[in-house]
Every structure is written in C-alpha cells, then in structure tokens.
C-alpha cells in the first residue's frame, strides 16, 4: 500500500491546483497539455488574469484611476486582448508594443509611452495613433519630441518621468528610481525641465510620472516617492504649471516563495489619503502594473530528460532552459518547481534543475526536493511575467509554445517556433 502523497498548494492557487493527484490549470490537466502540445510550454490562466485585475478595481473603487498594464511583462496578444476588454490602458516602451496594442483593439488614448530611447519614428507613430501621453525621460528627448510634434502640426502630451532617488529595496537590476539609474530626470532638476517643456512648441504638459522599481512588497518606498512628487507639484504650481494626472508607475510584487504580496487596495488607500491631504485628490492617478497582473497567472512546463547524480550535486536535466526563462540566471530569481503528477510513496532527492543550454549558468532552480523520474513533467511557477517575453533562440533553440486556459478549454495563443522559421530569416554569401 502506497503512502498518500502530500500535495503542495501552488502559488497561483486557486487557478492552479491539484486534482486527483495531477496539477491543473483551471479545469485542464497540465499533463494533458504537455502530452498534446509538447514542452517547454507556457500555460496561462485566463481567470487568474481577471482576478488580478479585479484586485486593482476593488482598490480603486470610485476614484479616477487609470490602470495601464505594463505590457513588457507579457505582451502575448491574447493577454493584451483580455486587459483591453477589461478596460485597461497600456504602458508601452516601443513602437512594436504600440502596434500590439492596436492589433488587439486597445484604446490608444489610454496608452502611456515610456522608455529612455524613443526614436523619432516611434514618436511619429505614437502621435499619429493619439496616445494619452509620452513619459519623457530626459531633456534631450523633450527637445526631439518637440521637433517631431511641431513638424507634424501636433501637440505631444507629456508627463516627465521624475527620478525621486528612493530605494525600493529590491534587486539592483530592477531598481529604477535611484539617482544612479538610467531612468528619468533627477527630482532636483525637474522644475527646470518642466519650465523648458512649457516653453517648447508642440508640447503640452499633462502629468508627472515616476517608477521606482519592481517586485516591491512594502508601501514605504511608494509613499516616500509619492511625497516627493507631491512636493514637486507644489513647486510646479508656484511656476504656474498644472497637471492633469499623477503617474505612480508599477512595481507591486508577487509571491514567488514566501513573500507577502502587497495588495493593491492596501497601497491605494494610503495613496488616496496622502493626495487628499495635500489637496490633489482631484487629479487622475495612473498606475502601470505588470508583474502583479500576470506573474502568477502562468507556468512554464518542462519534461525531465535525465537524472544525473554526481559526487558534489544531483542534477535534474530538463528540456527547458535559460533561453526559455532567463530570470534565474539573470537575477538569481527564485521560482517554485512542482511535479505535475507527484509520485506517491517515492523518496525525494535534492536536485539542481538545469537545462540543456551549453552554459554553466543554465539553471531554473537549485537545491529542490523532488521525487521524479525521466519523462515526468515539472511546472515552474510564477512564470507569467518576464518569461516568454525575455526568451531567446540561444543554441538555435526554437521558442516555446504558449497556451491560455479558459475553464475546461484551452487555446494555443502562440505556436511553437520551428528551426526552419529561424533559418528562413538568414542567408549566406552564396
């Protein structure tokens, strides 16, 4: 008689859960998806996307808040279409992202265009589309945008991205609000930059913007940044400059391991208190969440190829790799790893979960206790954000397929690449 296996609770519960000993995405077996569609495979839950967006709606209540999904986290068209249908705007950082928004019927009047390196052609495309505003990140960019807009006979709506020099206490690669980061205009220089903007042709000032980082799980960094922005609004008002909105960026963290995620309602209640007390309660608030909307709405499913014991380490070699999910390699990020169909009564071994790419840094997880055999499927959790969007073809590996589950049904929302497709883009000298 086998001992019943104790099943963990996935971080994406209830949208990812075990049923009859097998991990499911909503009503669909993850093992079935892997059998039918192959691995590596990204699996998204439509219900999880809606639940994450609803958490923001509850926190917003009747206030004037525009949620602009930070689509760099996951720009699959099916994901974008869901947020567009829910009424979201979009935070973009390239013309390509704008074209994705337009392709799914997103409202360009709800699009904010961020990014430090906007090209003139991108500015023209955004002006023609009628985006809500440009989050301008430097004075040279401001001058270029003025020239482009003036030449087109248009007025570019701008919000200057201010760098408040606030430490978000997160990984340095995803910290964006310190003075040594490349993003934004130093807050001490912002009043002069706004005066410059006010004098330029083709420019209409509409907002103030900041974004201090990502995977933040405390309110204090957000509120510190907000206080500095409100002080800036006071200075701008003294210069006769008024703004329509205050853009607080994104950055709310999610649970990867044992973190306590910051609920949107908890942050927003504090934000509303602050802006009301300072007399800016009538201003629209813009938010740019990305990870908190999609991170725990996705899994990366992979197949075990080999179990390789060595004197120093036991390696569990899978068919997914750093080219599929680079976060562990790039940030030493933690992702939970689950057996899709845990083996009852079998002793677990401790493994580093590694891929087939020819790099020592190709790993997905380290020192994980798993009871598995060759051919079993594993699910890498919290893979809905910064997963497929950061994938590459390193080692001439075609990128994974993506599937979205909706109740008891699933839809392939990105076909698996083929080597033939990769080779078709290249040519030789004859």
Where are these regions (language model features)?
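A charged N-terminal "starter" segment
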Residues: 1-156, 200-204, 238, 408-430
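Hydrophobic "anchor" residues on beta-strands that sit immediately upstream
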Residues: 68, 133, 157, 245, ...
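Short acidic, glycine/serine/threonine-rich loops at helix termini
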Residues: 79-80, 103-104, 123-128, 145-148, ...
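Charged (often Lys/Glu-rich) extended helix/loop segments that serve as interaction or gating elements
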Residues: 270, 280-430
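Active-site loop/helix belt of alpha/beta enzymes
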Residues: 2-5, 11, 164-306, 364, ...
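Active-site beta-loop-alpha junctions enriched in small/polar residues
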Residues: 70-76, 93-96, 116-118, 137-139, ...
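Hydrophobic residues within beta-strands of alpha/beta enzymes
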Residues: 90-91, 111, 134, 208, ...
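Conserved, mostly hydrophobic/aromatic
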Residues: 49, 72, 94, 126, ...
